[in-house]
Design a protein with these regions (language model features):
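Short hydrophobic alpha-helical segments of the AMP-binding
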Residues: 24-26, 241, 286, 368-369
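A short N-terminal helical cap/helix-turn-helix that marks the beginning
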Residues: 274-281, 340, 383, 397
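AMP-dependent adenylate-forming
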Residues: 102-105, 120-323, 329, 333, ...
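Motif- and composition-driven signal specific to adenylation
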Residues: 1-151, 156-165, 184-190, 213-214, ...
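Phosphopantetheine-attachment site and its flanking helix in carrier
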Residues: 221-225, 330-337, 349-373, 385, ...
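Amphipathic, well-packed alpha-helical segments that form the structural scaffold of globular domains
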Residues: 310, 333-344
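Conserved G/P- and acidic residue-centered "switch" motifs that form tight phosphate/ATP-binding loops
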Residues: 29, 85, 194, 202, ...
Length: 397
């Protein structure tokens, strides 16, 4: 970042990577444009801001970059793009390289203060690497006995250096578990829980999580926390969650449930969870099972769970079914089915219960504008969250 650059800040202040957006421009004398929440969550409005202010530097999660691309962004030849918060998919890296001058893959957990490593991506024949550690930071790939593993062998990533925090406030047990004495020098190491390996050419690559903590659209989620709350519902005997990428860039939370007696609908389950969880932690799909898959040791077999096919309908309750009849309803039905990637038989079904989320809203808005010459706002999909009510809103306007 240089003094004559303009940085577009799109990160919420509660997300640690906002630190870079707030302070880096001050350090170098660059210009900063702070996007409002309604702008950063709406691809078209964010695109307008980028053009209006001629921003040439932006940091965002993969979900936000996809939001921008799905809203028709063709790129900016001067733009330096930083992508972090969760793994940078290969297909998104290819899209971004076509649209900007530089692409950087950023990696770092909150516990080590924003970023710990970075890699400039120049080609996309292989999945983007995590790069090299930033100044005053050390990266170690270790086995269960805290021994370095050879190149090509997977291990857990440990981070040391000046960026380490002191631990978790009022959570001494967790602090002792993940902040350990550095066996290779002074200070401590942070145990990330990330599975990585060095390839034979020295590239550090991300291979997933070693625990149940996952990231969905940039949010860090503990699956066990959601499962505990689900089991509190009277209708649920047992349950488990998994994260499934139903197609490139569209990652969803899947709830697998064993019912006690009578099943409930996905909308009922989501309403139960909404009272206790933020929206990004509420599952988008519900799959009923006779029993959860188990290993020989009678532990939950999450790999088997993730390999199960998703049913076409994820809602199990008895709900009023209404088919599309008007021209507007039929057109919206076609768009929704393509974007959500599943057949829809009931135009009264809620967009979010069908698996919708903010990234898909951007795609629907773009498709409606292209195919129907109608401009919608992000808030419209929250206020008119089924095809029937959205069609009426469009017809009345």
């Amino acid at each position: 970042l240089q003094a004559d650059d303009t940085l577009m800040a799109v990160t919420t202040l509660s997300f640690d990577i906002a630190v870079l957006e707030l302070y880096l421009p001050l350090w170098v004398g660059a210009k900063i444009i702070i996007a409002k929440k309604q702008d950063s969550s709406d691809g078209r409005r964010l695109l307008s801001l980028l053009i209006k202010h001629q921003a040439n530097f932006m940091q965002a999660t993969p979900a936000t970059w996809r939001l921008l691309i799905s809203s028709g962004w063709q790129g900016e030849p001067r733009l330096k793009a930083l992508c972090g918060g969760e793994a940078l998919p290969l297909d998104l890296a290819e899209e971004l390289l076509q649209r900007c001058s530089e692409l950087w893959n950023m990696y770092g957990p909150t516990e080590t203060t924003v970023w710990s490593s970075c890699a400039q991506i120049t080609q996309t024949q292989t999945p983007p690497g995590l790069g090299l550690p930033i100044a005053n930071t050390q990266l170690y790939v270790l086995d269960e006995q805290l021994r370095p593993v050879p190149n090509g062998i997977a291990g857990e990533l440990y981070i040391g250096g000046d960026g380490l925090t002191l631990g978790y406030n009022n959570r001494d047990e967790l602090t002792r578990k993940v902040f350990i004495p550095n066996p290779f020098g002074d200070g401590q190491l942070y145990r990330t829980g990330d599975k990585v390996r060095y390839t034979h050419d020295g590239t550090l690559t991300y291979m997933g999580r070693l625990d149940q903590q996952v990231k969905v659209r940039g949010y860090r989620i503990e699956l066990g926390e959601i499962e505990t709350l689900m089991r509190q519902h009277d209708a649920i005997d047992d349950c488990a969650l998994s994260v499934r990428e139903v197609r490139a860039g569209d990652t969803r939370l899947i709830a697998y449930v064993v019912w006690k007696n009578s099943p409930i609908s996905l909308s009922e389950l989501r309403e139960h969870l909404r009272q206790q969880l933020p929206p990004y932690m509420v599952p988008q799909h519900l799959e009923a099972l006779g029993e959860l898959p188990r290993t020989l040791n009678n532990k939950l077999d999450r790999k088997a769970l993730e390999s199960l096919p998703l049913s076409e309908s994820s809602s199990l309750g008895k709900e009023e079914v209404r088919a599309a009849t008007t021209a507007t309803e039929l057109k919206l039905l076609s768009i929704w089915q393509e974007v959500i990637n599943k057949p829809i038989s009931n135009i009264n079904e809620n967009f979010f219960d069908l698996g919708g989320h903010s990234l898909l809203i951007a795609q629907i808005i773009h498709r409606v504008e292209m195919d129907m010459s109608v401009q919608l706002k992000f808030s419209d999909l929250y206020e008119f969250a089924d095809i029937e009510s959205l069609a009426k809103k469009i017809d009345q306007s």
